[in-house]
Regions:
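Ligand-binding "clamshell"
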Residues: 28-40, 133-148
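A conserved helix-loop-strand patch within extracytoplasmic ligand-binding domains
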Residues: 34-92
Length: 160
């Protein structure tokens, strides 16, 4: 069973216990999160959900810089920055909480790191453990671009 499906099944009550990532739990709908208990974080499968931008964007180091670029992009190109992600809820919440509002989310089903190269998005949010794939695709993590720390967890349905 896929890790996302475990979260869904716990949320709909058709599963009592399962293993999945903390990131997938936090990405799920709040109604689903309220039905699931983290029994134990397993201290493996550690990764971070991060904001990554193309290396050539040398003037962008922080989220505040990204906010500035987003407004410039909107004013000059008359469109919003496109952010490719498999984590739309966490990405939207994080960017809004940091004051970045001029963006459009692009759903990614895989190989998110390729989106800027193909011109499908200007930046991405993605899960990474070492950053190697990001670097191989000429992307770098913003200094304050960590959205969430994740790891494998034992999860259970909360029985009321």
């Amino acid at each position: 069973m896929h890790a996302r499906e475990i979260i869904e099944r716990l949320g709909d009550g058709s599963l009592d216990i399962g293993f999945s990532g903390f990131d997938l739990l936090k990405e799920s709908e709040i109604n689903t999160q309220n039905k699931i208990n983290v029994i134990k974080k397993l201290n493996f499968g550690k990764s971070n959900l991060v904001v990554a931008i193309p290396d050539p964007w040398i003037d962008v180091q922080t989220i505040a810089d990204l906010e500035e670029i987003a407004f410039e992009f909107r004013d000059k190109k008359k469109k919003r920055l496109r952010v490719a992600t498999k984590y739309p809820n966490l990405t939207r919440d994080f960017l809004f909480s940091k004051g970045v509002t001029q963006f459009k989310l692009i759903d990614s089903l895989g190989a998110t790191e390729a989106y800027p190269f193909t011109g499908s998005a200007e930046l991405i949010t993605d899960i990474t453990s070492t950053g190697e794939t990001l670097r191989a695709n000429n992307l770098r993590i913003l200094k304050d671009g960590e959205i969430l720390k994740s790891q494998a967890c034992i999860l259970s349905l909360i029985h009321i």
